[in-house]
């Protein structure tokens, strides 16, 4: 009877330990994407502060030229991707 109680206690303690380890690793994994996104947006904000000579996709292109890879739409005056069906 004592051996059965001891084995049940050890099994229960092992399951609790497994739960704690899994929870800790999962919480670390949840923090990793948040850190990556914050670092990406921090870099992105720094690049937005620089003044550019061209404008990007779906930006108004009346005064400034579109960046490479885009053309100014004659109809909407926005920078768009060049396509064969556009004139």
From Swiss-Prot:
Family designation: Belongs to the neurotoxin 10 (Hwtx-1) family. 51 (Hntx-8) subfamily. Hntx-8 sub-subfamily.
Signal peptide: 1-24
Role summary: Ion channel inhibitor.
Organism: Cyriopagopus hainanus
GO terms under cellular component: extracellular region
GO molecular function, one term: toxin activity
Cystine pairs: 54-67, 61-72, 66-79
Compartment(s) where it occurs, according to its Swiss-Prot or TrEMBL record: Secreted
Domains as described in the record: The presence of a 'disulfide through disulfide knot' structurally defines this protein as a knottin.
InterPro entries: Huwentoxin-1, Huwentoxin_CS1
Protein name stated in the entry: U3-theraphotoxin-Hhn1h
